[in-house]
UniProtKB/Swiss-Prot annotation:
Keyword Repeat in record: yes
Name recorded for this polypeptide: RANBP2-like and GRIP domain-containing protein 5/6
Lineage, uppermost ranks: Eukaryota, Metazoa, Chordata, Craniata, Vertebrata
Entries under PROSITE patterns matching the protein: GRIP, RANBD1, TPR, TPR_REGION
Matching Pfam families: GRIP, Rab_bind, Ran_BP1
Modified residues (Phosphothreonine): T19
Disordered as annotated region, ranges: 760-804, 924-945, 1214-1247, 1306-1330, 1580-1621
Lyase in keyword set: no
Phosphoserine sites (modified residues): S21
Localization annotation: Cytoplasm
Bias type Basic and acidic residues, positions: 931-941, 1594-1617
Record gene name: RGPD5
Ranges of Low complexity composition bias in the record: 778-797
């Protein structure tokens, strides 16, 4: 709220009264000045701001505010001075620099300061239009001297912004001022192709003036005629554009003047017309535009005039529109516009569209209006009246174009709606999708009986936009579709129409059109609607400015909710009803299944939104929102009396959607519940369609009765419609088709019923119908119940009967081939025997051929149909599921009429031709694949002409096969004699004298007999009684063309079984153009190799059979739905369809969503088959020893790595290790160590066999091989399933790729992996484990030593962090990288530096020395970020950088600061820094890490007993070793799933990373760096167990632990351990162990080394650690496989846990899980290390012992928490 001057003065006085200090009063002057500025008291504002500047002279905001006040007073000099001072105080004010430059150029361009500030602003705003204008002003003041510079400036600006109107006009003006008119005309001609310029009034005015000046100049007179014609062409086009823009934006007087100027240009061009050139075509088109604009101007004059005679104006306007509409379209192309569209063609479409619609609008409701206009005004009098109404000048009419044009030849031609719809599409392209134009067109169609083609309009504008979305519930801009935009346009047109009707008052003349012509009508849509439409167009065409993209998306997203009636949409119910009715009507009129489904589906969506509102309307009215997208109109509010009718319409739409989806029964039930003519009509369509579908086949009596019932129901419903229409005429309006169409359909149904009553569909008047007159077809449609009520039933030219198309194609094919057959048939007639009875055909005698596959039709004779091609196998009408008319269009070259003698003629129809064939038809010369395993005879190798190609792939059924003798039907069987002599093709008998049995039946059989055999075989068995003749007839057939020898067809699918086959359309993604391209149409098969079990996917194109997909199916493949379709799946695979392996992204599109879902299920089932793992539930849990062995191997690896660390740190430790090895007590235990528990143990055990891994294997992305695990043999030493780094001949598993890139799937018939069990391999007692060999797919290159430059430096600090660099140009911190930041110290010169590399890429992002003058400072607002300045060399060159590093934790940040300060001190003292590594490892350095170890340990379960005799199990050790006694007992334990032979693999299982070592730590005596060296020794005849943990940090139970007080390393290595760190009693042992807390702190271990020795040891230790890290990196691939197998083990654990038979061990397993979870989630360190012996011991104890262990662990944890606290 703006304050007045009095309000501000009172407020200022009150504030000053409370402020005693003068300085404080002055400090408030800025605020007071702003208040006075708001009150527009600029003098008082200057007064207070000046008092503020006196005390705060360096405030840039105050100087800027003062400059603004001076600028308002137009005191430019003082304003510039204030702005300049503000910029000096704050140079970041870029906009103020531009402001100073603009003020100086505005004040005095010649001022030298202006040039300086313009150049300064140009550096800050490169490419800014404001800068260009300032530079242009500076160059203009230089006159002719600056023209060259100005020309260069304009050219450079045009290159950046070619659509800028001002720059183009400026260039043309520069050409004109320099007398370079030809260049100006050339630029105008070139720029006319730019749509942005064509829509500018200023640009078109400039072009018209330039072209007129050029035509009048001397240059034009000297030029040739073609140049003059081209210039005239451009001038006429410019006049047309200018006239259109002027009508929209200027007043009537300017429109008149411009139209008169346009008239003069047409008159001058008229005199020089000749021939069919560009100027003539343009002149004719511009004539039409001239009259169209004249008619629009007349109506505009009526809109703005007073006391207007609308009748006179409308009649003259109708005359103009008639002339414009009857101007023919141009026949030549003028030039190409945007997107290659012809410019004249688009202008002609726009003219015809506007003129046609205005003619219909003016003549609406007036009979013979156009005829009267032509009779009255199509003469000289009317022409004179038109001239007087348009032009006000007194020039003679004869010299003008309008006065001299001949208008007496026009006809009364009313536009056709079909033509208008076609013209509208071109007009939309001309207007580039303007919402105003689309709304105007919609309003014109709103008054016409036909529906507007909005769908076609939008498809012209948005080619690639999907028609419908499956995500109606979302409002994401990416989900927008054509239907959303169509609904939006419907809403805009609907509300605009209602608004126009409200404006038409009672004085509205009948001659005044409801909607004015497009150029003169006001804006028809709201600003909100226009902004949303523009935002959608910008996003779809990807023309958004980067900074404006988010705003556009938000705008589109907000209105999508309204369009889809989501949430609080605020739509008027009447509008929702309008949308639903329009969509239902449009969808019903479509022939496309998907069109119907999408339109009717969206209609149902809106009806569901309307129905709840209708219930509310019964009680209350719907509230109107404040600012809706579509305005509410109370004139169309739904009344309570209309609610029932709308609810009925909604339920009819629901039923129609059911019918479209194929739910016919539901649709029939719904329609029958609604008593209305619309439901009766739909029911009639449904039942008639059912009858048609049955009629297509040869009908049985039951089918005839069913068809008759359907036709009867159809007749009854049609009669109901006619009766209701006769009784109530208002009912007819609801009917979706004319009543005449209903009567026509009824007559057709009655005729069909009469046919049934006369003998069925195959009989008429007691005789057989002609085959060629009764062939019926069914045009395939995605839905067989296409409800099209908007069209007449059968006689509409747009939708002919479904069978006519196929019948016409069949008849055309017959006509083409009759001539080819006639010659041969004449020869056959001449050679035929007169004694033989002829086969009587309906017209002529043709040789018998076969029919194309899939052809169906009514046939005169069973087995002898009228046919077209000879390659199809079927003789019955058996339509294929994927019916394709291409089967009927085989090339004529396939037709080979067989020349035969008179002996080959068939019997007459009286005797019949009754071959007992199956519905699958005949097959010539080849059997079905299903019969290949049967014994077959070799086809006869003679000159027979009956061997055809293999077309078995087209039909699944089996049929009669000619050319085989074993179990097939042959012509030899047909004419078999009584003596039993057979018949062979091509065999000549010299004694043959003709048929002796002429006149008898050749073929007689019984269909029932063959029907019984059809279930087991597709071939006919021989029947001697059925095919015997009286004499032995040796029939000889002479082939017309000698057939080549039969070649066995090899497809590569011989040894494979078809698991799945379905017709699909395949697509391939082209990465170059980023589009899906169709690859072929055919059957997609999934084949299984019967030998090796491999599965592959194969697809061949139809007819040509070219392979378009051929690849293996692996478990790593993943089906993903294709966006925008629920019938398509896409996947990636190495495809071999082109011969070589190529990674392709493929997509298969199915006919229905059900088929797509079936394919997905089959695909996943095949992936599960690849796993080949049987699902078995163990009935008894038996411990086979695998879990125990797995834990043993893991612990061996850990202890080996720890001992290796200890070995690296101390020479004394090395001595101890050597002694241990010498006495056979190696702590790192070799990998041969096994656990040998008591053989007599009968406790409960676990079984780890019979894995069911199918569920998890599908998620496995590593291996596609199948794994089969089976129970192991009960041998003491078992063979392991997996083994690294060794090869064994008995290997059953290999990580070799299942797909070799050098061979295609069709060539690889051998399995790449073999699956077996442990029992399949014979092992001996000496073979401890099977060595599994893993052959790499791609060999690795030789290992190259990587030199990082950090070799001679120790890592003092290392932790993951994020580093930033300060960018001075933008004044912001910018992220430089994320990685490990290290502080390194050189061993030689003690220099310290900071090094940081980015993750993965390892690029340096920090590299500089730490100098004494450097200091770390906290960044404001956070304590975890340190900031410093250094000379950094990260980019190779020295550069001063402001750096900042951010850590995740506060203690890490503090540690970094501490080490940083120590580094500065250490450099001064020339000493080494004590290393501190703040974390153990990074993900990159530790591929496996502790999580993998924890998961591995979590997945293990075992139970063993304590070793007997003197061997005591050391519960605290990390490595278990067995007794070496000669007595060997069988261990019922499970071998581990993984056994690693390589030492480097073992080392990954260490629980800690190798750390830099600190001498003089506080570990207990006998420990070094946290590791115990008090290795307990056994007796002389037993081995020792090394203790890998002791000291203060390794106590299991402080209260019960007893340690040696004064022991050292030498004593511990020679003495026998008496007190163990942790031990538990067993059932067989009564030994009690006590645990006591040490009485005093153990003494520190001191090592007296020299400085050089310490440095040398640290170097060697660091190098060893680096070498260890290298080994860890080498086995990264192995770890990945390990982790995947661990996942499989986890899934098995979960399965076993769900087993009800594990009740006894469930509690123990639950506790073990809890301990393991504690181990996983504890931080690395002593707390985690202390759990290891607990876990190991627990896994070996009985349930009772584990319960005791639980109490021990609980006490330990409580003590640990108290000590840490």
């Amino acid at each position: 709220m703006r304050r007045s001057k009095a309000d501000v003065e009172r407020y200022v006085a009150s504030v000053l009264g409370l402020t005693p200090s003068p300085r404080q009063k002055s400090m408030k002057g800025f605020y007071f000045a702003k208040l006075y500025y708001e009150a527009k008291e600029y003098d008082l504002a200057k007064k207070y701001i000046c008092t503020y500047i006196n005390v705060q002279e360096r405030d840039p905001k105050a100087h800027r505010f003062l400059g603004l006040l001076y600028e308002l007073e137009e005191n430019t000099e003082k304003a510039v001075e204030c702005y300049r001072r503000s910029v000096e105080l704050n140079p970041t004010q870029k906009d103020l620099v531009l402001k100073i430059a603009e003020l100086l150029c505005k004040n005095d361009v010649t001022d030298g300061r202006a040039k300086y500030w313009v150049e300064r602003a140009a550096k800050l705003f490169p490419g800014s239009p404001a800068i260009y204008k300032l530079k242009e002003q500076l160059l203009d003041c230089e006159g002719e001297d600056g023209w060259n510079k100005l020309f260069d400036l304009i050219q450079s600006e045009l290159y950046v912004r070619p659509d800028d109107v001002h720059v183009n006009i400026r260039l043309v003006e520069l050409y004109r001022s320099t007398k370079r008119l030809k260049d100006a005309v050339a630029h105008c001609h070139e720029a006319e192709r730019n749509i942005a310029l064509r829509s500018s009034l200023e640009w078109n005015s400039c072009v018209v003036q330039t072209l007129k000046e050029y035509l009048e100049s001397l240059q034009c007179l000297e030029s040739d005629k073609s140049d003059w014609q081209a210039t005239n062409t451009d001038l006429l086009l410019a006049y047309a554009n200018l006239m259109l823009l002027t009508l929209s934006t200027r007043d009537v007087q300017e429109n008149r003047e411009l139209l008169e100027s346009f008239d003069s240009a047409l008159q001058s061009a008229k005199s020089s017309l000749g021939g069919n050139d560009e100027l003539s075509a343009t002149f004719l088109e511009m004539k039409g535009h001239f009259y169209m604009y004249a008619g629009s101007l007349l109506l505009k004059m009526g809109q703005h005039g007073n006391n207007v005679q609308w009748r006179a104006l409308s009649e003259l306007a109708a005359l103009c529109y008639l002339i414009a509409f009857q101007v023919p379209r141009p026949k030549i192309k003028l030039r190409e516009g945007k997107a290659g569209q012809n410019l004249l063609e688009m202008m002609a479409c726009d003219r015809l569209s506007q003129s046609g619609h205005m003619l219909l609008s003016l003549s609406r409701g007036k009979q013979d209006f156009l005829k009267e206009v032509v009779e009255t005004f199509a003469n000289k009098i009317g022409q004179s009246a038109l001239y007087d109404a348009l032009f006000s000048s007194q020039s003679p009419k004869d010299t003008s174009f309008l006065g001299s044009d001949d208008i007496g030849k026009i006809d009364v031609q009313e536009p056709e709606l079909e033509d208008l719809a076609r013209y509208d599409v071109g007009a939309i392209r001309a207007h580039n999708g303007s919402l105003q134009h689309l709304t105007w067109l919609g309003l014109q169609w709103n008054s016409l009986p036909a529906l507007p083609g909005i769908r076609k309009w939008l498809k012209q504008l948005f080619h690639r936009l999907p028609h419908e979305t499956s995500r109606l519930e979302t409002n994401a801009p990416e989900s927008i579709c054509i239907l959303d935009l169509e609904v939006f346009l419907l809403g805009v047109v609907y509300t605009s129409h209602l608004q126009l009707k409200e404006k038409c008052n009672s004085h509205h003349s009948s001659y005044q059109p409801l909607c004015l012509p497009f150029p003169v009508c006001k804006q028809l849509c709201t600003e909100r609607q226009k902004s949303w439409w523009d935002a959608v167009c910008t996003l779809i065409h990807r023309k958004a400015v980067p900074g404006n993209l988010a705003k556009l998306r938000l705008l589109v997203q907000h209105e999508i909710n309204t369009l889809r009636a989501q949430e609080k949409h605020g739509l008027q119910p009447a509008l929702l009803v309008h949308w639903a009715k329009y969509l239902q009507k449009t969808g019903s009129g479509l022939n496309s299944f998907y069109g119907q489904l999408e339109y009717i589906g969206r209609s149902v969506h809106y009806w569901k939104k309307v129905l709840p509102l209708l219930k509310i309307i019964k009680k209350n009215s719907i509230p109107e929102p404040i600012d809706p997208l579509f305005k509410h109109f109370h004139s169309v509010d739904i009344q309570a009396s209309e609610i029932v009718e709308y609810e009925e319409d909604a339920h009819i739409t629901f039923a129609m959607l059911d019918a479209v989806n194929g739910n016919i029964e539901d649709a029939v039930t719904a329609f029958e519940s609604i008593k209305s003519v619309v439901s009766y009509w739909n029911l009639a369509l449904i039942f008639h369609r059912k009858a048609e579908d049955i009629e297509n086949d040869a009908l049985s009596p039951e089918e005839q009765e069913e068809c008759r019932n359907y036709l009867t129901k159809t007749r009854d419903y049609l009669i109901k419609i006619i009766d209701d229409g006769d009784s109530n005429l208002s009912v007819v309006k609801k009917l979706p088709v004319p009543l005449e169409s209903v009567k026509q359909m009824l007559n057709s149904v009655m005729q069909e019923l009469e046919d049934y009553s006369e003998g069925g569909p195959l009989y008429k008047n007691g005789s057989l119908r002609n085959a060629d007159s009764e062939i019926k077809h069914s045009t395939p449609s995605p839905t067989k119940y296409s409800l099209s009520p908007s069209k007449s039933y059968k006689y509409s030219p747009e939708t002919p009967p479904r069978w006519t198309e196929d019948r016409n194609s069949l008849l055309n094919m017959i006509c083409q081939q009759v001539e080819a057959i006639k010659k041969e048939m004449q020869e056959l007639k001449l050679n035929s025997s007169k004694s033989a009875s002829r086969h009587r055909w309906p017209t002529e005698n043709y040789g018998p051929d076969s029919v194309p596959d899939g052809y169906q039709g009514s046939q005169t004779f069973h087995g002898a149909p009228l046919t077209v091609a000879t390659t199809g196998p079927s003789v019955y009408y058996s339509q294929s599921p994927a019916y394709n008319s291409q089967y009927l269009l085989r090339p004529a070259a396939n037709v080979t009429p067989t020349k035969g003698s008179s002996n080959t003629e068939f019997k007459s129809t009286k005797e019949g031709f009754s071959i007992p064939v199956s519905a699958d038809g005949f097959k010539f010369g080849i059997s079905e694949p299903g019969n290949q395993e049967k014994k077959r005879e070799k086809p006869l190798e003679n000159d027979t002409g009956f061997q055809a190609q293999d077309i078995s792939g087209r039909k699944k059924g089996r049929g009669v096969i000619f050319g085989q003798t074993s179990s097939t039907f042959t012509f030899a069987d047909v004419a078999k004699s009584t003596s039993g002599e057979g018949f062979q093709f091509g065999k000549k008998d010299l004694n043959f004298k003709g048929f002796s049995g002429a006149g008898e039946k050749l073929f007689s059989s019984r269909y029932g007999k063959m029907a019984n055999k059809a279930n087991t075989s597709g071939d006919f068995e021989k029947d001697d009684d059925a095919y015997k003749t009286e004499d032995s007839d040796d029939i000889h057939f002479e082939p017309v063309v000698q057939m080549p020898e039969k070649v066995e067809l090899v497809t590569g699918e011989e040894g494979e079984k078809v698991l799945y086959s379905q017709g699909v359309k395949l697509f391939r993604f082209d990465a170059e153009v980023r589009q899906w391209k169709e690859r072929g149409l055919g059957n997609l098969k999934i084949l299984k190799n019967e030998v090796n079990g491999k599965l592959r996917m194969l697809m061949r194109r139809e007819q040509v059979l070219k392979v378009c997909a051929n690849h293996w199916i692996t478990t790593t493949m993943n089906l993903k739905p294709l966006s925008g379709s629920d019938r398509a799946w896409m996947w990636s695979a190495s495809d071999f369809s082109d011969g070589d392996a190529k990674l392709e992204r493929l997509a298969a599109k199915f006919k229905t969503p059900e088929l797509a879902e079936e394919f997905k299920q089959k695909f996943e089932e095949c992936q599960r088959l690849l796993l080949d793992i049987p699902l078995q539930t163990p009935h008894k849990l038996v411990d086979t020893g695998r879990a125990a062995k797995l834990i043993q191997r893991a612990e061996e690896m850990k202890s080996g790595l720890k001992d290796f660390k200890t070995f690296l740190t101390n020479d004394q430790t090395k001595v101890t290790e050597e002694e241990n090895k010498g006495s056979g007590t190696g702590a790192a235990g070799a990998s041969d160590t096994t656990i040998k528990p008591n053989a007599e143990n009968t406790g409960p055990t676990l079984e780890w066999d019979n894995y069911d891994l199918r569920e998890d294997a599908l998620d496995d992305s590593v291996s596609s091989s199948s794994v089969h695990a089976s129970p192991l043999a009960s041998s003491p030493v078992r063979k392991n399933l997996f083994r690294f780094d060794e090869s064994t001949t008995g290997s059953n598993f290999s990580f070799k790729s299942a797909l070799s890139l050098s061979k295609s799937p069709a060539k690889l018939n051998q399995s790449g992996t073999s699956v077996g069990t442990d029992e399949e391999s014979v092992v001996t007692q000496e073979e401890e484990r099977d060595g599994q060999y893993f052959e790499p797919v791609v060999p690795l290159p030789d290992l190259v030593e990587v030199s990082s430059g950090e070799e001679n430096e120790q890592v003092v600090f290392s932790h993951r962090a994020e580093i930033y660099r300060y960018d001075k140009d933008v004044g912001q911190w910018k992220e430089r990288g994320i990685g490990d930041i290290k502080i390194l110290q050189n061993y030689d010169n003690k220099q310290v530096r900071i090094v940081m590399r980015r993750d993965q890429v390892l690029k340096l992002c920090a590299n500089h020395r730490i100098t004494p003058d450097m200091s770390l400072q906290n960044m404001k607002g956070t304590e975890r970020v340190w900031v410093w300045t250094a000379c950094d060399f990260a980019d190779g060159e020295r550069k001063v950088e402001h750096l900042a590093v951010r850590f995740k934790l506060q203690d890490v940040a503090d540690s970094f600061k501490k080490i940083f300060d120590e580094a500065k001190t250490a450099q001064e003292k020339d000493s080494l820094i004590t290393p501190h590594v703040s974390r153990s490892s990074t993900p990159r350095e530790s591929p496996c890490g502790k999580i993998a170890v924890a998961i591995l340990e979590e997945t293990t379960r075992e139970r063993t007993d304590v070793i007997q005799g003197d061997d005591v199990a050391d519960a605290a050790s990390e490595v278990e070793v067995s007794s070496t006694s000669e007595t060997t007992t069988k261990a019922v334990v499970s071998p581990p799933k993984f056994v690693f032979v390589s030492e480097s693999v073992k080392r990954i299982f260490s629980s800690e990373k190798s750390k830099p070592f600190v001498f003089g730590n506080s570990s207990a005596t006998g420990s070094l760096f946290g590791f115990s060296f008090n290795a307990p020794l056994k007796s002389n005849n037993s081995e020792t167990s090394s203790v890998a943990q002791s000291g203060s940090e390794s106590k299991v139970e402080p209260k019960k632990c007893e340690l040696s007080k004064n022991s050292d390393i030498e004593q511990s290595s020679d003495s026998k351990v008496k007190n163990l760190s942790a031990s538990f009693p067993t059932e067989e042992s009564s030994i009690n162990y006590t645990f006591k807390t040490p009485e005093k702190e153990p003494p520190l271990w001191h090592a007296e080394f020299t400085k050089e020795e310490l440095v040398q040891k640290l170097r060697s230790t660091t190098k060893s650690a680096d070498h260890l890290n290298g080994l860890l990196r080498e086995i990264e691939a192995t770890n990945a496989v390990l982790m995947e197998q661990i996942k499989l083990l986890k899934s098995e654990i979960r399965r076993l846990e769900r087993n009800q038979e594990r009740e006894k061990s469930a509690a123990n397993l639950e506790y073990l899980k809890n301990v393991l979870l504690q181990f996983i989630f504890l931080k690395p360190g002593s707390e985690r290390e202390r759990l290891l012996p607990v876990i190991n011991t627990m896994l070996q104890l009985s349930p009772e012992e584990k319960g005791k262990l639980a109490a021990v662990a609980q006490d330990e944890e409580e003590n640990a928490s108290r000590s840490s606290g």
